[in-house]
């Protein structure tokens, strides 16, 4: 008995704890099986994973809240329309906002300058710090300023209140762009910067200069073409008029052939042209016809003051001066056809004064005259018989019988 009691006294406190734990676990171990231990370990691992995921979810929520202001302050990477859109949509800025309809932006210029434009880096939004430069940027991107009309009432109290409101509203500026509207950020793609005149490419300016030069040359060619057509039309009209008056235009060969046959001197009332000029019939008729008709007064024949007239035909008279020939017809109400050609026959009579001229009493006073050989155009009436008949102008002559 003494030996047993000594063994019980030698038991340490640790042994007592292990014995107590074994006594407490013994009921549980009695009801557990080997497969239940595996299930228990899986449950413990799952609970540990849930706790670890919960701790991880709480920490990113704090980091996201810290990083959002950094994204909002990153205005340097945005263009002007998107910067403007962002500050209008933000509640942080009080100097700029939408109007009631959301179609215009309202800017308090004084407050806008202090709140946004005068901010320093790294919080600067726009590159400029002047309100005029900012308004110029708005105009370049298609924003237009809208004037607000204030209606005043006749009552004093309401008038004063409206006056205060108008003074406040006068500080506000309204700007409109059809592609800048509240709730339509997709329209910002259409808000583009306008290209100024100074930034135009030199290729376009060279193209415009070449186009103007070509247009000027084309216009000059058209004017020359029109003048040529007008000259041809005038020649055709004169030629048709001469045909209607039975006055054919005489060529150089026919004139020289007729002059070689015979010559009769007559007097002419217009001065001779310069010897150096040689003009064709079609070119000289249009310019000299009116001057010759104004200068000619009368034409007298050398033989007994009579005029020659063909019966039923027109007789063309060729008069020669010192250097040129003139085809003159006294018929058709004083119409004279004129052809100027170089002279091939020497002058029969030189230039004579009025006092020395024969039959000077037959000439009007102050009318110079000169001797010119005259030949009837036989080609115009080859078979006609000429007859001397008194002219109706002889009735007014003092020597008329």
UniProtKB/Swiss-Prot annotation:
Entry keywords, A to Z: Cytoplasm, DNA-binding, Nucleus, Transcription, Transcription regulation
Locations listed in the record: Nucleus; Cytoplasm
Biased composition (Polar residues): 1-11
Tissues/organs with expression: Testis-specific. Present in Sertoli cells and spermatogenic cells (at protein level).
SMART domains in alphabetical order: HSF
Residue ranges, annotated region (Disordered): 1-30
Domain of life the protein comes from: Eukaryota
UniProt keyword Transcription regulation present: yes
Record-level Gene Ontology MF annotations: DNA-binding transcription factor activity, RNA polymerase II-specific; sequence-specific double-stranded DNA binding
Pfam families for this protein: HSF_DNA-bind
Keyword Transcription regulation attached: yes
Example of a GO cellular component annotation carried by this entry: nucleoplasm
Record feature DNA-binding region, as residue ranges: 76-194
Family: Belongs to the HSF family.
Protein name as catalogued: Heat shock transcription factor, Y-linked
Source organism (scientific name): Homo sapiens
Gene name of the encoded protein: HSFY1
